[in-house]
Amino acid sequence: MDIKFYTEKLAREARESQKFLRRVTTDIKNRVLLRTAELLIEKKEIIKEANDKDLEFAQKKGYSKALLDRLTLNEKRINGMVQVLKDVASLPDPVGEIISMWTRPNGLRVGQMRVPLGTVMIIYEARPNVTVEAASLCIKSSNAVILKGGSETINSNRVLVEILRQAARESGFPERAIQFVDTTDREAVNHLLTLDQYIDVVIPRGGEGLIRAVAEKATMPVIKHYKGVCNLYIDDEADMEKALNIAYNAKVERPSVCNAIENLIVHKDIAEKFLPEIAYYYGKAGVEMRCDERALEILRDHPKANDTEIVPAKEDDYYEEFLDLIIAVKVVDSIDQAIDFIHKYGSNHSESIVTENYTKGMRFINEVDSSAVYINASTRFTDGNEFGLGAEMGISTDKIHVRGPMGLKELTIPKFIIFGDGQIRNNVGIPEDEEIKIDTEKCEM
C-alpha cells in the first residue's frame, strides 16, 4: 500500500464531503444515528466475533487486565453504544444556532452562529466504543470524521465503521464524511498529521506518550489532555460517610480511566479518623496505598490496615497517572496546602473537595485551576454522558475555549453573520456627482 496516496485520498474525501454536510438536515442526521443503533443490535454477534479476535491478539501480546477490559465489547457495552446513539439523536442540533445578535448604531445587525469545525481526526487507543461515540457526535454536529483506532482494535473498529457507513447510505447521509484509517502502519498517522490542508483539528485519546507524539507532529490544531492525575481532598470538616464513599468510588470503581483519582489529600485533623477506615476498604479492594510519612505513622501497625499494602511514597508518585489500583496519599495542614499540592502535582483534569463548609468549598472551586472541579462528589463523573452531553469526543485541559468534556457544542465554532440594508463604512461610496448606471440589457454574444 502506498501510504501517502492512501492517506491523502482519505483526508481529501473527508474534506470534500463538507459541502454535502452543509445541506444535511437534522432529521437525516438523527436517522443515521438511530439506524446505527438498530444495526448494532442486529449485528451484535458479528461485533463480538471481531472483538474476540482483537482480545485474542491482545492476550498473546501480554496486555494488562486493565487494557483488556478497555478493549472488550460485551453485551453491556454494545447496549451502552446503542444508548449513546439514542441520547445524541435526542439532543438539540447545535449547527445553525444563533448564539447572540445585536444591532449597531448604523443599523447593521451583527450576530454569531454555530457552524461545524470541518474535518475532525480522532486518534485513540483501545476502547472500540469510542469509534461509535466519536462518529455520532461528528455526524450530529455536521463534521466529517477520520477515525484512527489502535492496532489492537482494528477488527472491532472495522465492523463498527461498516455499520456506521451502512446507516449513512440508507439514510441519505454522505458516506465519505465517515473515514476510517484501515491500516496498522504507523506512517499513516504520521502523514495524516501533516495534512492541515484537509484536516481542521485532531483530537488524540490515549496514553501520555501517544498524545505528546501527536502534539509534536501535528501541523493542525490539537485538542488534548496529556494525562489524568486527579486529586481528592478530604477537608477537616468533611462528612465521614461521604468522604469514604467518594474516596472509594473515585479510585476503585474503574481505576484504568483518566477521571479516577491518583492522589488522596487528607487534612491532618481528620487523618487519624479517616485514613484507617479508607485503608480498610481499599485493602478489601486490593488498592496499594503509597503514603507520606504522616500517613505512614497513622497506618503503620493499625489493625484496620493489616490487609492493605502500604508503602512509602516517592516524590514521583504524586505526578503519576497509575491507571491501576494504586493511590498516593498526602496529609496536609490546611486547604491552602491542599490547593498548592494540586497545582504542583495535578494535570488540570478533575479535582474534588469533601467538606460541609460552604466557604471552603467555593474557595476550592474558585482557586483550583482545572477543567472540572467538584464539591462532595466523585471525579468519576467527568464524562460527556454523565454531564448530559450525550457522549464526548475527549477531554481538554488546554487553556482554550474548549475545556473539559467535549460534546456537540464543543465541535462547533462561531461564525459572524451580518444583516445590512446597504450600509457602507465611513460613507465612502460612489461620488455624489457620478450617476450610477445599471445596464439591465443582456450582453450580445
From Swiss-Prot:
Which keywords does UniProt give here?
Amino-acid biosynthesis, Cytoplasm, NADP, Oxidoreductase, Proline biosynthesis
Q: Which ranges form a coiled coil?
A: none
* GO CC terms, sorted: cytoplasm
Per its UniProt record, what InterPro entries does this chain match? Ald_DH/histidinol_DH, Ald_DH_C, Ald_DH_N, Aldehyde_DH_dom, G-glutamylP_reductase_CS, Glu-5-SA_DH, GPR_dom
- Give, as in the UniProt entry, the pathway in which the protein acts: Amino-acid biosynthesis; L-proline biosynthesis; L-glutamate 5-semialdehyde from L-glutamate: step 2/2
GO aspect biological process, one term: L-proline biosynthetic process
Q: Please list the GO terms describing molecular function.
A: glutamate-5-semialdehyde dehydrogenase activity; NADP binding
Pfam families in the record, alphabetically?
Answer: Aldedh
Show the catalytic activity: L-glutamate 5-semialdehyde + phosphate + NADP(+) = L-glutamyl 5-phosphate + NADPH + H(+)
Function, as annotated, reads: Catalyzes the NADPH-dependent reduction of L-glutamate 5-phosphate into L-glutamate 5-semialdehyde and phosphate. The product spontaneously undergoes cyclization to form 1-pyrroline-5-carboxylate.
According to UniProt, the name of this protein is Gamma-glutamyl phosphate reductase
What's the source species for this entry?
Answer: Persephonella marina (strain DSM 14350 / EX-H1)
Q: Which gene encodes it?
A: proA
